Curated annotation (Swiss-Prot):
Gene this chain is encoded by: murD
Name of the protein in question: UDP-N-acetylmuramoylalanine--D-glutamate ligase
Entry keyword Hydrolase: no
Keyword Ligase among record annotations: yes
Binding positions for ATP per the UniProt entry: 109-115
Disulfide bonds: none
Length: 444
């Protein structure tokens, strides 16, 4: 009997373990951290052996195949040992893809992928299609394949997940953009990160579709290298050479495969970045044959994504916006660009090799003050202090950051949490960071 070992027992790992067990493999799960009770219960209910708090190498190195959590780096010592002895190391998505014939609509990009994924899922769901949501959001793809049946899966893919995917095929691949992110995981080499993102197109055939932002210089440069077999569906803000989706005369237009149009002001999501998200989602739905009426309705009634430019409250004339999902500089750029008042920006956290020059002009133009929130704010001081803005340095947590921002903000201004950084220095996740922000804003 083939032995499958799963490293990491979160949503992805626990789901992969259930699918492996259901498919008749000897299955073992190992997690260096504590396993959440709900995942222990899931594993126990399927009689799957597990360990937590350590990795017992003799129980792992004898695997025929290993499924690893996206959070484990490829250069972790245990992963290097497995690779050195020739043991295949794959992702949960790669494993799950072997056991379903569903159509796969996969979305990646440095920014916008969660909103676009959620929006595509909303359109498909609103059209009464049998669809699952998976990847970075939703339930584990492997668990859904094991326990449910769907005709379509809408899957958000990070570069970490794409790294360990080899034979998986996206029927529709969406690449929103590529800007520097996670370079600490890619030897601080931008090309390594670009290569990871472009893995979403591997294995695509002439029957498949590749949707991408036409104005992204990196994507355009890489397209010339790759010679893709899939049909290309570029989108842009305005009508231009090659773009099949764009805005013209305040109207959203998609020209292929079926002509579609709607008034831009009817889109539920506002802002330039959200226009791109809506265009990519509209093309995806169009390719799936969803009616124009259903696409229009879903694009106009979508509620948005938590922690992404989420309006929290207005306190004594000051607006508070939660953009905790902005874990890189480019995300913060989009957030600042959308601000219509002077802004107190809360930023900081675990720096991933950030270059803050991208937001320099916007910070000078839009910000009235800055709050640095993190255990190590030296890089922020070195870059931003020269702007001469009032600064608060907070190393204790979100409560103090919110109170500091509130004191710095004037009536009619906005406090924006858009950190540019990962959350893991002071918080469990970007969700935890955003939830704490909302909690302490509401306590003001």
């Amino acid at each position: 009997m083939k032995r499958i070992v799963i490293l990491g027992a979160g949503e992805s790992g626990a789901g992969a373990a259930v699918l492996a067990k259901v498919k008749g493999f000897e299955t073992f799960v190992s997690d260096m951290s504590a396993i959440k009770d709900k995942y222990k219960d899931l594993l126990d209910s399927h009689h799957i052996a597990w360990e937590e708090g350590h990795h017992t190498e003799e129980l792992i190195l004898n695997a025929d195949e290993v499924i690893k959590s996206p959070g484990i780096p490829n250069d972790a010592p245990l992963i290097l040992k497995l690779k050195a002895q020739g043991t295949p190391v794959i992702s949960e998505i790669e494993f799950a893809g072997r056991y379903t014939d569903a159509k796969m609509i996969c979305i990646t990009g440095s920014n916008g992928k969660t909103t676009t994924t959620s929006l595509i899922y909303h359109i498909f769901k609103s059209a009464d299609l049998n669809v699952g949501l998976a990847g970075n959001i939703g339930k584990s793809l492997a668990l859904q394949v094991a326990e449910e049946h769907h005709d379509y899966y809408i899957i958000e893919l990070s570069s970490f997940q794409l790294d360990n995917m080899y034979n998986f095929r996206a029927n529709i691949a969406v690449l929103m953009n590529i800007t520097p992110d996670h370079l600490d995981r890619y030897d601080h080499c931008m090309q390594n990160y670009i290569d990871a993102k472009f893995r979403i197109t591997q294995n695509q055939t002439t029957d498949d579709a590749f949707i991408f932002w036409n104005d992204d210089p990196i994507i355009k440069q890489e397209l010339a290298k790759h010679g893709l077999k899939a049909h290309l569906y570029p989108f842009a803000a305005v009508k231009e050479d090659g773009a099949i989706a764009y805005v013209e005369d305040h109207e959203v237009k998609i020209t292929e495969p079926i002509a579609f149009n709607m008034e831009q002001e009817e889109l539920a999501l506002t802002g330039q970045h959200n226009l791109y998200n809506s265009l990519a989602a509209g093309i995806s739905a169009n390719l799936a044959g969803i009616t124009k009426e259903n696409i229009r309705k879903a694009l106009s009634d979508f509620k948005g994504v938590e922690h992404r430019l989420e309006k929290v409250a207005r306190v004594r004339g000051i607006d508070f916006i939660n953009d905790s999902k902005a874990t890189n500089v480019n995300s913060c750029w989009y957030a600042l660009q959308s601000m219509t008042t002077k802004t107190v920006l809360i930023l900081g956290g675990k720096d991933k090799g950030n270059d803050y020059t991208e937001i320099e002009d916007l910070v000078r133009e839009k910000c009235s003050a800055l709050v640095y929130l993190g255990l190590h704010n030296e890089k922020l001081h070195a870059f931003f202090d020269r702007f001469g803005l009032p600064v608060a340095d907070v190393q204790t947590g979100m409560k103090d950051a919110v109170e500091a921002a509130y004191k710095l903000a004037k009536k009619g201004e906005t406090v924006l949490l858009s950190p540019c950084c990962a959350s893991f220095d002071l918080f469990k996740s970007y969700e935890d960071r955003g939830d704490q922000f909302k909690k302490y804003v509401r306590e003001l």
